[in-house]
Amino acid sequence: MTLTLAHYLVLGAILFAIGIFGIFLNRRNLIILLMSIELVLLAVNMNFVAFSSWFGDTAGQVFVFFILTVAAAEAAIGLAILVLLFRNLNTINVDELDRLKG
């Protein structure tokens, strides 16, 4: 059995749906929210690589590196906010983010 473009797209759609489901299901825990966003970005990257490989163009694979760079910066900023929230309030609840003003 050979893997076709449809197999990769279905896997990307499943990962994307799990990520969106995680975002909507758990909006209070910041760690789960960040992991769900990263899962959505992983699904998008998988689709870029699948289309790039299928059509023989390397532009999609190069674009994935830019997305991974932005995702790493987003994760670093999100984790910095998480550490700040936990140090000040001893919680990682997203509802408490409005207390970090100042």
Curated annotation (Swiss-Prot):
Catalysis: reaction(s): a quinone + NADH + 5 H(+)(in) = a quinol + NAD(+) + 4 H(+)(out)
Record-listed E.C. numbers: 7.1.1.-
Cellular component GO terms held in the UniProt record: NADH dehydrogenase complex; plasma membrane
Coiled-coil residue windows: none
Keywords from the UniProt entry: Cell inner membrane, Cell membrane, Membrane, NAD, Quinone, Translocase, Transmembrane, Transmembrane helix, Transport, Ubiquinone
Compartments in which it is found: Cell inner membrane
Transmembrane segments: 5-25, 31-51, 62-82
MF terms in GO: NADH:ubiquinone reductase (non-electrogenic) activity; quinone binding
A GO biological process held by the record: ATP synthesis coupled electron transport
Membrane topology: Multi-pass membrane protein
NCBIfam families, alphabetized: PRK05715.1-2, PRK05715.1-3, PRK05715.1-5
Function in brief: NDH-1 shuttles electrons from NADH, via FMN and iron-sulfur (Fe-S) centers, to quinones in the respiratory chain. The immediate electron acceptor for the enzyme in this species is believed to be ubiquinone. Couples the redox reaction to proton translocation (for every two electrons transferred, four hydrogen ions are translocated across the cytoplasmic membrane), and thus conserves the redox energy in a proton gradient.
Quaternary organization: NDH-1 is composed of 14 different subunits. Subunits NuoA, H, J, K, L, M, N constitute the membrane sector of the complex.
HAMAP family registered for this protein in UniProt: NDH1_NuoK
Family recorded in the similarity comment: Belongs to the complex I subunit 4L family.
Name of this protein: NADH-quinone oxidoreductase subunit K
Gene: nuoK
